[in-house]
Amino acid sequence: VLRSLREKIKHCQTKDLYRFSKIIKSLQKTKLTGSKQKKQISELSELINASVSTSKSNRKLIPKSIHFPETLPVSLRAKEIRDSLRENQVLIVAGDTGSGKTTQLPKICLDAGYGVRGLIGHCQPRRLAATSVAARVADELNTKLGELVGYQVRFNDRFSENCRVKLMTDGILLAEIQSDPYLSKYEVVIVDEAHERSLNIDFILGYLKRLISKRDELKIIITSATIDVDKFSNHFNRAEVISVKGRMFPVETRYLPMNLASEEKEKTISEKVCDSVISLAREASKGISDAKDILVFLSSEREIREASRVLRKKKHKNLEILPLYARLPQSEQSRIFKEHTTLRVILSTNVAETSITVPKIKYVIDTGLARISRYSFQSKIQRLPIEKISQASANQRKGRCGRIEDGVCIRLYTEEDFKTRARYTDPEIIRTNLAAVILRMLSLNLGDIFKFPFLDKPESKSINEGFKLLAELKAVNEFRKLTKDGRRMALIPVDPKHAKMLLVANSKNCLKELLIIVSLLSIQDPRESGHVELNEADYESDLYNSKNSDFLALINLWIIFEETRKLGNSSRLKKFCRQYRLSYTRMREWKEVYFQLTLTCRRIGLRINKKPSNYADIHKSIIAGSLNQLAYRSTERQYIGSRNKKFIILNSSVLARALPKWVVTGELIETTQTFAAMAAKIDPVWIEEIGEHLVKREVHSPHWSVRTQSVKAFERVRLYGLTIIEKTRVEYSSVNQEHAHEIFLSEGLSKSAVKTDAAFYKQNQQILEAIRAEENKLRRPEKFISENDINAFYSKAIPENITSTKELENWIRDPESGASKKLILDRMALFDNNENPSTNEFPDSISLSSNQIPINYTFQPGAKKDGATVQIPLQLINQLSDADIDWAVPGIIREKCIALLKGLPKATRKKLIPISGFVDDIISEMFELRGDLFKLLATLLIKQRRINIAPVQFANISLPDHLIIKINVVDKNRKSLAIGSNVNEVKRLLSKKGIDFQR
């Protein structure tokens, strides 16, 4: 019975096949009693019969006789293709332009008996192609669209349960893989326009390569016009190839002659185009035909404007010049389809190569150049360099003429140049960031991406770059496994960067605003660029522009558009769009994307905020997906971004004049220079918050902070080479506790920079102040105790985990610490060999009229107050003499005498050599005699060496500050009134201030 059922499931629906096979295997292994087994087999049999019945019903939906137009070349090969499809799992159909492959292949599949057990899925790269092909196939099968043949594109579908052929974009098929990894509802999958090699197409081709080994009943058809059949065939295990000629008229190819190549190099592209157009215009005027227009392929909008300007200067009669590029308003694009009588010249980018078919083209002029999007792994920028096109692209351009009669293709390069070009354009997968592909593969559990069967395997650095971006977005962990955020991001059908923005917006309660922004970033910008340059006064975007952010301008535009929509009908909306140069179609698409993303976000548990959010949270959310798109202004207009990227902000941005210091931008684009079209002012502090997992922190300059009574350091925060925060204070103990402890001891305690009421500290400070005073007298800092000695003392006593005054006080309060005994300095133990400094030569005071006049000692070389200062009360100044001052500090007399004698003229000094020896000879006698130092020194010079020196000469000799005893006159509150170096000087200063000192 089970063998019979196994045979029967070959006729059931493909979506049921795996499930039924699994149940049969289970029943074969399970040992059940007769009644139970019979019951399960009976239930399974009913399910299989129902599925087979569905297949029979589906067969009735398909016309018994399917007509293939004889005028189409593929129709002549229909039987061959049908038979080959039955015999092979994978079939490659290389059909030239006009062969009819796109419309006839799904019909051939129906004719071969497919579409009964499952759908015939037909992938197209563009929505317009999917919908128009579906309508055409339905018409040829004499059915209404949505009955036998339907379509599904983003936000729109015409599809019913009875549909056996499903046209769709490749993005739709990818989305279905998410929920149906085996594509079980499909019996045939057709991948059309495979030559375009977009990311989606390459991923689908790799996925199908794996899938065919798991579903041997699945049929795959790969088709395109310009396709490398050998590469595709080998990829699918030497798949069968059928080539079909196109329904084209002969096309004459004219190359730039070699002898003119060097001469033509001197001309600009616009001049070359102009010469060719004028020549062809003359040729066209001689004949009568339906096709006479000229299609010119140029590399950029700028080249189109320049060529248009040069052509208009020629003022050629009956020559209509039309531009064509993606950003051109739809109303201007549609002009190429309107009837006309004049000779028409269409100046186009490569949009006319595949996306748009321009009618009635007799001539093609190919410059051989195009902007090719390439991702730079070094700068992390999507570049748009102008490059030579491939041979396949050149032939695709050539195929734009010769469709309704003979054509001419003029190539503005030599035949030799053409032969040396690459055969095919590099696929998108090797010239873009792979983050989105990797995220999708991880979510589908497709295993090691390095082993995935891509048609062209990306380089390892490309894959690693994709993983780096996902790590930046926190979508993968250090093991390259999906995080919780990564799994949710994979469910949101937008770029991973934009998905990250939405997740962060959810946490910051600004999801509604970010849905508006991300929805627009996911489509082509609806704000149109006309062919004619606009004056700023003519441009009315100020209605919705924001002062500081292009992203907020999008929200403002959305609000205004919604208000207009609610107030009026579609005609009013269209008028609004024309007024503000907006594409009505893209504005509707924006709304549809917003609606779909909103549903997705709700489905995965995100909450849409009802109240408006704030500027900071909105832009923090944008930063979360744009951590590689941050920059600061370095010059008047130039910005420097991560990894030293230099760029400017376009004039179309609201920041073009404001140019704030820090910005977050949309994607940077590199053409002849790098620019940002969208930007917003930000606070760099937001970057640190959002990019916390990526920033590099450099802690430097650790120091003791008297204000906080702890060890602080400065932190520099960087992201991808950008210094976000130059200098912010941090607690150094959290960075390096051991070093912080050392600084606490050396710069805090040892330098007496600690503020505490602890008893040990007060006692130690008194001891240290007394010792420092003695050292200052002797002018020998650290003679008795150095900072190193103090540091060593505290280091032994204080635990290593203490780095601040607060921690020290907490430790002291602990009764088990024993701190009170450990922390008190022993004064006598500090002096070398118990040497106590003598105070005889450096007294603390002098006696004057039974009063003790204090002497202060300062050791500050170079400062005026360096040395000893006598603090004399105002009422005693008249009792003070210069002799009292001269002998107030006996310890400096010898050094002062030596300095005075060294200040004498050279001839005199020679008689005293050695001067120090002479002073030693007279010093004891000086101490016996005392009195005015200058007079005493002069007297002893005559007596000992017969040298006659007037005492006044010594008064004119400049002495070091520390050898001059200062007089500081103070009032009863110890406030300084006058400071001088002798009695007469201070009296003069007092008189000058009007202070009475005679009483």
Where are these regions (language model features)?
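Short, isolated positions in well-ordered beta-strands
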Residues: 249, 647, 853-855
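Second RecA-like catalytic domain
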Residues: 4-7, 290, 310, 317-318, ...
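Short acidic-hydrophobic surface loop/beta-edge motif
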Residues: 155, 241-244, 636-642, 842-850, ...
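Generic recognition of stable, solvent-exposed alpha-helical segments in well-folded globular domains
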Residues: 80, 100, 104, 128, ...
